[in-house]
Amino acid sequence: MASVTFRDGFLCVSALITFVFVFVTGADFVRFVSFRAINHNLSGAAPLCRDSVPWSVALRDGVVQKAVAVDVLLLVVFSLQHSLLAWTPVKRVCQSVFGVLSRSVYCFTTAAALQILMHYWRPVTSAPCLWSVSSAPWEIWFPLICFIVHFLCWAIICSILLIFDYPELLGIKQVYYECLGLGDPLLLKSERAQRLYSHLRHPVCVELLTVLWLLPSFPLDRLLLAVFLTVYLILAHSLDKQDCAYLRHQLRNKLQLFSTPLEGSEQTNDNNKLE
């Protein structure tokens, strides 16, 4: 049995802390971007906006301007962290400094930047909403529809993360392979898979965009969040024909894999009948 060194223990604890922190941050983000806004409509709390105030007056309000400035600054900080650490020269420096923990460091700092964004986010309540569903019976039904759609989108996002090897995305697999002396797990994948992973940084674009834009009430701060993240996701999308062909090939293989046991069991039953 291989002995566990202090270094191995440190790597495992660091990766585990990162996993827990990212998981908690993900749950907080779901509540921040989705269910808190929908629950606000269902609970009948104070309105998110002041529709009686004209836009010309609201945009000159110092409180609105300060809140918008803070929110834009938070979004810029998050995007800089998320993009700068994914830049190839910076990735090489992180790899040389942190080694096998470089992916965990990236995920940890991303979660930290997201926590800062959510904690210091300033709702803009002194400006009108872009839209607000407040007429009966849609004031009840539309938030429920949004809740169901959001729930389905988050379920799809979780399933996609499972398909895309989430232990590797969070840096856990790298540490596990390092402790066993197996090397980098990404190098064990095919070149086409490595190419896809390098291009598909955000495999949940459609679902996340649906969550960002589908709400019963759409205040100004939500517009900032939705527009900024939409532009960021579009700019980060770099799939080409080869990647799409590889995805179609993998989907075809998965469908064949699921159909093979069924066909095999049917053939076995037929053979048993013949015997």
Curated annotation (Swiss-Prot):
The chain crosses the membrane at residues 5-32, 64-85, 103-119, 139-169, 197-215, 222-239. Residues 33-63, 120-138, 216-221 are perinuclear space. Keywords: Membrane, Nucleus, Transmembrane, Transmembrane helix. It is found in: Nucleus inner membrane. Residues 1-4, 86-102, 170-196, 240-275 are nuclear. It is a multi-pass membrane protein. GO terms for cellular component: nuclear envelope; nuclear inner membrane; nuclear membrane. Its main location: nucleus. Belongs to the nurim family. This is Nurim. It comes from Danio rerio. The gene is nrm.
